[in-house]
């Protein structure tokens, strides 16, 4: 291998990433960066490796360096925001996702992550707005995940009929999603539709017999029948 060719090191690193060999991949990216320190793609890819290793602070440093060389590097902004979100730095993460949306106003990933940040900050109305904006964009990509967080937000807002509606739409594409079915069962119970809720939780018992939240819900339903 040509040790002085940064592109060869870079592509070797990308291949190693495909096999989840992140430490080896980072060595390749480091070798590439020694030759060309301004390689924004190598910096970004090194950050990706660090994300997989859950080394979020170091990953953010790599993404910042990549952004320094390429201020409109959408994926670097997106993954910096994700690293901040996973580090519970939700307000800083929101700034990154806004940068993504400035570059691409139809980024469903950014809207989804924004909704999750707002939810964790307790701003349910903003979270719901992001979900609805994401769902208004054409295409099914991420729709199940967006509908799930939308259902969680609506549940916290006490809008149980809307939770049921959102969950039903999501379940059309993902009928085996336990979390969605659990949310729907909770919404049915809290909306006073106890028999419908009971039929659904009986199905869920067969899927996850050890879920204590499910047994609490069953007890709640039986108290009201």
Annotate each predicted stretch with a short phrase.
Residues 18, 52, 86, 120, ...:
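Register position in tetratricopeptide repeats
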């Amino acid at each position: 291998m040509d040790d002085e060719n940064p592109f060869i090191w870079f592509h070797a690193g990308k291949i190693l990433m495909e096999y989840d060999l992140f430490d080896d991949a980072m060595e390749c990216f480091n070798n590439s960066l020694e030759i060309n320190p301004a390689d924004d793609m190598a910096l970004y890819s090194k950050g990706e490796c660090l994300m997989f290793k859950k080394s979020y602070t170091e990953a953010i440093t790599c993404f910042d360096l990549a952004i320094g060389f390429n201020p409109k590097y959408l994926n670097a902004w997106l993954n910096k925001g994700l690293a901040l979100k996973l580090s519970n730095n939700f307000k800083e993460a929101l700034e990154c996702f806004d940068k993504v949306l400035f570059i691409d106003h139809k980024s469903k990933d950014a809207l989804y992550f924004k909704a999750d940040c707002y939810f964790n900050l307790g701003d349910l109305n903003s979270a719901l707005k992001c979900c609805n904006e994401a769902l208004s964009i054409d295409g099914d990509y991420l729709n199940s995940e967006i509908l799930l967080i939308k259902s969680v937000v609506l549940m916290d807002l006490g809008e149980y009929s809307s939770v049921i509606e959102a969950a039903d739409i999501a379940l059309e594409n993902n009928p085996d999603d336990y979390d969605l079915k659990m949310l729907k069962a909770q919404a049915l119970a809290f909306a006073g539709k106890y028999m419908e809720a009971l039929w659904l939780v009986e199905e869920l018992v067969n899927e996850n017999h050890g879920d204590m939240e499910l047994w609490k819900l069953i007890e709640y339903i039986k108290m009201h029948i």
